[in-house]
């Protein structure tokens, strides 16, 4: 558990350092054509702050409830026999949710990062001459791989140290003194070795699931705050209106994916509901924050574009890596699906369905 907490903190610090360091590159961006930036804002007839504020007030509880339902459903699945961890339906639900998370990274977060970091509000050099969005996404994915591998390495070292310790026999001695002791050890050694191997594999898998759940939540939370902030700061009633339904579905399905990861991690009840709480409130919090700073927040300012673009790129790297490596690959190359061709096909159908549904949402959110 200590290693998963360390991974969570290290990833958070890395993203924060990136987002506060890179804005310094915007020093020359103030020379960008402001009028050209403002021209990107869209239909002026939709700009009605009073109407937009009313819609935002409706959006906050709606998105909060949708988020809570989505992330909580998998946690209650233990009481539903058909959704038990050993049932086929559980695998289908997990692959569906994994497809949703993959599409979130590719179809929602990464394009937003491209839009921000290639905006005409930023100077051509260096922002138009180097693909910062994909570069940061790649670095983010590699950092997640590095953190996860170091965590597992640290766990393996700790386990090997424990195995090297001398365990006293029942008589208190550290050595085998009698023929009876030798016979007892020979008869029981095979069973003990197998049992220790099973326990070690289970513990290692559990640690891996904890790391996955925490890093996945981090990527989703960063993205959710950014979405909420943009919505809260907007005075475009047309944009806000279309976002309400889209974000409700977005948070519902994304929450199901996160909830499945939290369930597999087998956290304590307090940790489960803490993670549920943070996922549920991040988008509404972002909306409230955006409303509070609406008068001073300029989404076309160089600093805002770079900070939001970097955060989106980092989040995209986290989500894409997690969906492909830790969720889909783990599921499809596991013995449960590999030994069942029908489940194999259904798993892919569910994955493509989840990805297609979330991709369709990209039209509105």
Swiss-Prot record:
It is a multi-pass membrane protein. InterPro entries: ZIP (IPR003689), Zn/Fe_permease_fun/pln (IPR004698). GO terms for molecular function: zinc ion transmembrane transporter activity. Keywords: Cell membrane, Ion transport, Membrane, Signal, Transmembrane, Transmembrane helix, Transport, Zinc, Zinc transport. It is found in: Cell membrane. It comes from the Eukaryota. One of its GO terms (cellular component) is plasma membrane. Residues 27-56, 112-129, 232-242, 294-304 are extracellular. Residues 78-90, 151-210, 264-272, 326-344 are cytoplasmic. The chain crosses the membrane at residues 57-77, 91-111, 130-150, 211-231, 243-263, 273-293, 305-325, 345-365. Its main location: membrane. Residues 1-26 form the signal peptide. Belongs to the ZIP transporter (TC 2.A.5) family. Probably mediates zinc uptake from the rhizosphere. This is Zinc transporter 7.
């Amino acid at each position: 558990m200590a290693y998963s907490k360390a991974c969570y903190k290290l990833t958070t610090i890395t993203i924060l350092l990136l987002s506060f360091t890179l804005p310094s590159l915007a020093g020359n961006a103030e020379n960008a054509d402001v009028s050209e930036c403002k021209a990107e804002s869209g239909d002026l007839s939709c700009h009605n702050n009073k109407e937009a504020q009313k819609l935002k007030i409706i959006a906050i509880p709606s998105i909060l409830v949708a988020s809570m339902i989505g992330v909580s459903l998998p946690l209650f699945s233990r009481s539903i026999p058909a959704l038990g961890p050993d049932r086929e339906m559980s695998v289908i639900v997990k692959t569906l949710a994994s497809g949703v998370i993959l599409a979130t990274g590719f179809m929602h977060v990464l394009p937003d990062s491209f839009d921000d970091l290639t905006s005409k509000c930023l100077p051509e050099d260096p922002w138009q001459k180097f693909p910062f969005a994909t570069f940061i996404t790649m670095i983010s994915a590699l950092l997640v791989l590095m953190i996860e591998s170091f965590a597992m390495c640290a766990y393996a070292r700790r386990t090997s140290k424990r195995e090297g310790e001398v365990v006293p026999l029942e008589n208190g001695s550290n050595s085998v003194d009698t023929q009876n002791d030798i016979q007892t050890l020979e008869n029981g050694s095979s069973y003990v070795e197998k049992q220790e191997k099973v326990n070690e594999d289970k513990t290692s898998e559990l640690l891996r699931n904890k790391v996955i759940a925490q890093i996945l939540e981090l990527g989703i939370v960063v993205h959710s705050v950014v979405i909420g902030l943009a919505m809260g700061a907007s005075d475009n009633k047309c944009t806000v209106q279309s976002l309400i339904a889209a974000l409700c579905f977005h948070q519902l399905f994304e929450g199901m994916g996160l909830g499945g990861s939290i369930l597999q991690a087998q956290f304590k009840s307090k940790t489960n509901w803490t993670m549920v709480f943070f996922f549920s409130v991040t988008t509404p919090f972002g909306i409230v924050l955006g409303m509070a700073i609406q008068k001073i927040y300029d989404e076309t300012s160089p600093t805002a574009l770079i900070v939001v673009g970097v955060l989106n790129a980092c989040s995209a790297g986290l989500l894409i890596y997690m969906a492909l490596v830790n969720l889909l690959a783990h599921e499809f190359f596991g013995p449960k699906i590999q030994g069942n061709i029908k489940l194999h096909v259904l798993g892919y159908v569910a994955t493509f369905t989840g990805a297609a549904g979330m991709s369709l949402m990209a039209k509105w959110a």
